[in-house]
């Protein structure tokens, strides 16, 4: 979702250098193929721990951080007046999927050197506690796999590759073949397999046309549409409009995602339709089968303790989320209110060694 705007701003931002982690680069290049009229760009690969010198006075270092997709990077901008840290979307996860945990010692070392300004993800700032580990999600999904008697139909975000990997791994454990549905998900899985970010045995993933060769209890379908999108796989399946996957009453449907604000009605209508059709339905309110990629209040506290910034600027979230995040700056670091900037889209914030305004 964050890289999708690039084709639309390319003609407005001059000719900057582009850097991205390997998976991000591959997904971006695939995205840009859909916009043949946009000018071609060259994206340089950057790895966690590497630093790019922009000028004599400016450089950018990136560190590994965890999210719902591999290759997430925290960005540290080194300036003459101090370090500016942007967390990106993040959570702390000791047991991530096909990824390494964030290096807390490296984060602390930057805190020891001094951080002038921290821009931190606020999406989970209204939720108390730690974000759920992907390990917990896999354990709960396995409960469903153990008891499912027919096909498993699992829906999630097309970019939630960690969840796709868990579903593939569990399918292999329980001797199920996997069918991928949804253009974005198919593309993302293909790219991730090529780069080694999704691991599957040679004959695990099959084409929909081969599904009839296996009994229902040996089939898992992973697709898009958990937000109730009208043209996505899950809605067409629920309405009996999907050519390749027709609904059956012994199907088990898994919503492995939370509901994005604004989609509540369409998701509820979709769930109601599935219940009316007689399938078994599991969603995140019944058991922990979805973990947000965004840290909750305890994750945010931990980042603040590690980096100990002079100034805090909550980012990414509704204003209410950023306001709750600001409270943590006061609570954890005893930060005065004037050292916290609550800005809205379009506002310009000026930072000096002594103040933020």
Show where each model-derived region lies.
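His/Asp/Glu-rich metal-coordinating catalytic cores
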Residues: 1-214, 232-246, 265-269
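C-terminal regulatory/interaction regions
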Residues: 169, 173, 192-357
């Amino acid at each position: 979702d964050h890289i999708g705007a690039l084709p639309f701003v390319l003609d407005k931002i001059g000719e900057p250098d582009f850097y991205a982690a390997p998976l991000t680069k591959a997904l971006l290049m695939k995205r840009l193929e859909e916009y043949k009229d946009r000018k071609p760009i060259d994206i340089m690969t950057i790895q966690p721990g590497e630093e790019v010198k922009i000028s004599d006075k400016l450089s950018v270092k990136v560190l590994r951080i965890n999210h719902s997709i591999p290759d997430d990077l925290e960005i540290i901008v080194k300036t003459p007046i101090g370090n500016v840290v942007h967390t990106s979307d993040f959570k702390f996860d000791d047991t991530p999927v096909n990824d390494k945990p964030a290096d807390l010692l490296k984060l602390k070392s930057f805190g020891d050197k001094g951080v002038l300004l921290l821009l931190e993800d606020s999406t989970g700032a209204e939720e108390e506690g730690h974000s759920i580990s992907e390990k917990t999600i896999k354990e709960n999904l396995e409960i469903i796999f153990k008891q499912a008697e027919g096909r498993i139909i699992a829906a999630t975000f097309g970019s939630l590759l960690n969840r796709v990997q868990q579903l593939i791994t569990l399918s292999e454990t329980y001797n199920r073949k996997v069918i991928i549905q949804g253009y974005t998900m198919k593309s993302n899985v293909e790219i991730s397999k090529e780069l080694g970010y999704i691991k599957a045995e040679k004959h695990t993933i099959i084409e929909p046309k081969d599904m009839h060769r296996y009994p229902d209890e040996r089939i898992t379908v992973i697709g898009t549409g958990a937000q109730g999108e009208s043209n996505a796989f899950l809605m067409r399946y629920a309405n009996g409009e999907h050519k390749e996957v027709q609904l059956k009453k012994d199907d088990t449907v898994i919503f492995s995602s939370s509901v994005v604000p604004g989609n509540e009605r369409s998701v509820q209508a979709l769930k109601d339709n599935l219940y009316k059709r007689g399938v078994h339905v599991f969603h995140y309110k019944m058991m922990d089968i979805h973990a947000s990629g965004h840290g909750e209040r305890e994750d945010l506290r931990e980042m603040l303790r590690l980096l100990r910034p002079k100034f805090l600027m909550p980012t990414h979230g509704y204003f209410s989320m950023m306001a709750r995040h600001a409270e943590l700056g006061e609570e954890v670091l005893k930060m005065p209110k004037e050292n916290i900037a609550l800005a809205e889209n379009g506002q310009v914030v000026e930072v000096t060694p002594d103040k933020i305004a």
